């Protein structure tokens, strides 16, 4: 409300195929999870904090699963192939067969490594970077899908007792909506009316304002069409990028036609 946080949402987490949660416990603002996949057991931590970085060199709060950091050691660069090769198994000590991997440099630029067909061979991902990156600090982790679905864009009214109800005596025809975001990278807006789905990509910093190699983050407003009956429309925000995503406001416009009036 007025771009101030007034309520948290309920969340659902999916840790992917073949992952079993053995135990979970919260300490302070962190949850520790004991998990198991086909290659062994391991522990993960989830932080319930905003604007939090795990290392001082982290360029921004990276949204990555199983996030680690290390410097690329000498001897990783091949002059013949003009690339730098890094094997992740020595750093993780745990095998991971599935998932797209992101490697982010301290300046904010990131490299994407899609999951190969059939998964990572032997659960030991090996990453090849163009050029010589020896001595460069990387932040590495697995991509995950962030998905937020807005509640229905309906007219709310408050009675004398302070209760809130939905105005449902007429038809609300939506025209457009918008989201306000702060210090945010790329994301996708999905609009579904039950019969068709429309995708609108937001690229982060506007074209012409960004610099190559710098984080593409922006604070702005994005407007998009939402046509049809408000009851049938669903609006969802989706992102698989490691960049921050902070939605601080939302609004909509439409035409309301009241079918009946009280006497």
Q: Where are the language model's segments positioned?
A:
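Beta-sheet repeat architectures centered on beta-propellers
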Residues: 1-263
